[in-house]
A protein has these predicted regions:
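N-terminal (or domain-start) structured segment
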Residues: 20-109, 147-150, 156, 172-201, ...
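C-terminal lobe and pocket-closing loops
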Residues: 204-273, 302-305
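An extracytoplasmic/periplasmic, membrane-proximal ligand-sensing/linker region
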Residues: 24-26, 171, 210, 258-319
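Bacterial N-terminal signal peptides that target proteins for export
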Residues: 1-9
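Short, Asp-centered acidic motifs that coordinate Mg2+ and/or phosphate
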Residues: 82-86, 123, 196-197, 215-216, ...
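Bacterial N-terminal signal peptides
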Residues: 8-17
Length: 319
């Protein structure tokens, strides 16, 4: 056999061996937000078990800025070898592409979906100062007072802005948006009655609801949430088909080899089947909701136009 053929075979075997050995070094998970937030909690919960499955350390790296865009760019430019992943939320994956006209990345163009890991429903809240007890009460109350009811959000273009816009579209209500710099000041004004309505993630909403500081009227998931078991879903409350939830997922740079993607996706599946992980995830306010690489890609393709419509309806732009 000619020497050049032997060399080609040797190189092919070396390449196959390299892929088969993945991973051989620590894996970096980039988060486009500061430490201490919900994504950080989610990353650390999964990293603890993921490194046991893969046999390599999982290092969480924070690259915050521009609504997650800085972190996304960092991962997009990384080698497509499976050693750099991004943990992203709804905003980074499907809201930002509609919010920024000059966004430096396209989610399905510049990234390879690895796994969806969680869904995060929200609660629809009102100030206790309003004389309403149910979502139907609130809808009727607001319809009788067009333009007199304000809703607060953590800022323009975020999920706490867009979910109320979806609610407005579904009900035909006219409410005025009051954006804040984060959810904390918005909650303060909701408690005080300066704004009357808000959509917020379950953990914080449940805590304030149980203290009587706000009143939860409905949750936005298809099923009731364990943290608010007595609160009906929006669908139960008469809003047919109103299921709006945020989600978390892991992505790699576009061009990551299929066998590496499969190894990572399978590892996440094993971790997500761990009862301890699922229980702790629920305690953090997220619903375990695994999708493998292909299904996650289809999910993102379906969610993108939905959120794009909400952004357009809101009029939000962040260029």
């Amino acid at each position: 056999m000619p020497t050049r053929h032997l060399a080609a075979i040797a190189l092919a075997l070396l390449a196959a061996s390299a892929h088969a050995a993945f991973p051989e070094k620590p894996i970096r998970v980039v988060i486009g937000f500061p430490a201490g937030g919900p994504l950080d909690q989610h990353a650390r919960l999964l990293a603890e078990k993921l490194q046991a499955v893969l046999g390599q350390p999982i290092v969480v790296d924070y690259k915050s800025g521009a609504g997650g865009t800085v972190g996304a760019q960092d991962v997009m430019k990384a080698p497509a070898d499976g050693y750099t992943l991004m943990l992203a939320n709804t905003g980074v994956m499907v809201i930002n592409p509609a919010l920024y006209s000059k966004l430096p990345y396209g989610t399905l163009k510049d990234f390879t979906p690895i796994a969806r890991t969680a869904m995060q429903p929200l609660a629809l809240l009102v100030t206790p100062k309003l004389p309403v007890k149910t979502l139907k009460d609130f809808t009727e109350y607001t319809k009788a007072r067009p333009g007199q009811i304000n809703y607060g959000s953590a800022g323009n273009g975020g999920i706490s802005h867009l979910v109320p816009e979806m609610f407005k579209s579904a009900t035909g209500l006219f409410m005025v948006h009051i954006p804040y710099r984060g959810s904390a000041p918005a909650f303060t004004d909701l408690m005080g009655g300066q704004v009357q309505f808000m959509a917020e993630s379950i953990p914080q909403a449940a805590s304030y609801h149980k203290q009587g500081k706000v009143r939860a009227l409905a949750v936005t998931s298809r099923e009731r949430n364990p943290a608010l078991p007595d609160i009906p879903t929006a669908i139960e409350s008469g809003l047919k088909g109103f299921e709006v939830v945020g989600f978390y997922g892991f992505l790699a740079p576009a061009g990551t080899p299929p066998d590496v993607v499969a190894t990572l996706s399978d590892a996440f599946k094993q971790v997500m089947n761990n009862p301890e992980v699922r229980s702790r995830m629920v305690s953090q306010g997220a619903d375990p909701a695994f999708l493998g690489s292909a299904d996650f890609g289809k999910f993102l393709a379906a969610e993108t136009p939905r959120w794009e419509k909400a952004v357009k309806a809101s009029g939000a732009r962040l260029d």
